[in-house]
Amino acid sequence: MSKLNYIKGDLFSHKSSASSILAHACNCRGSWGAGVAAIFKKQFPSTYKLYVEHCKKHASNPSGLLGSTYLIKSESSDPGNSGRENVAYVACMFTSDAFGRRKNSADDIVENTDKSMLHLESQLAELAKTEPIEQQDGVNVVNMPKINAGLFNVPWEETEAVLKKHQVLINVYVI
């Protein structure tokens, strides 16, 4: 079972001696135009470019990305890496096909979050074999805001319940 730690502060100020994993919920349409995604775009522009390319590759069936996570190593030149010993990884969790009025239902978003976390866990297990990623007591650490609770409008308690099922430590940043 996952442990969730709530941290009052800015997700983007999180630092670790190893590479940090910064996760957020994404749409499958290649848009980080609002909410925390817009901040990710500003802090880690190299990852935004790769995210857009990834979505374009799946443009014929964007919903095929649902329930997956695209884990992207950022570049040292990204503003979000200022002051970091190792560059951050951005985990794009595809929880809704679209956004705005076309976003998926809350139930679908929660189900896709569960699948995205499973995908992320398997990627982190492999990555930890070759890269120094943030861990606590041998458990991989993921840092995130209250995903899905903003523009996707999913009650946090529903996402929280799913996150608690997973085998990672999650630092949830709240303002």
Curated annotation (Swiss-Prot):
Q: What class of enzyme is it?
A: hydrolase
Q: Which residues bind substrate?
A: 9-11, 25-27, 32-37, 147-153
- GO-annotated molecular function: ADP-ribosyl-[dinitrogen reductase] hydrolase activity; phosphoprotein phosphatase activity
Keyword Hydrolase part of the UniProt annotation: yes
EC code(s) of this entry: 3.1.3.84
Q: Which cysteines are joined by disulfide bonds?
A: none
Q: Which reaction does it catalyse?
A: ADP-alpha-D-ribose 1''-phosphate + H2O = ADP-D-ribose + phosphate
- Span of domain Macro: 1-175
Which keywords has UniProt assigned to this entry?
Hydrolase, Protein phosphatase
Q: Which family does it belong to?
A: Belongs to the POA1 family.
Kindly provide the name given to this protein in its UniProt entry: ADP-ribose 1''-phosphate phosphatase
Instruction: Say which species the protein is native to.
Output: Meyerozyma guilliermondii (strain ATCC 6260 / CBS 566 / DSM 6381 / JCM 1539 / NBRC 10279 / NRRL Y-324)
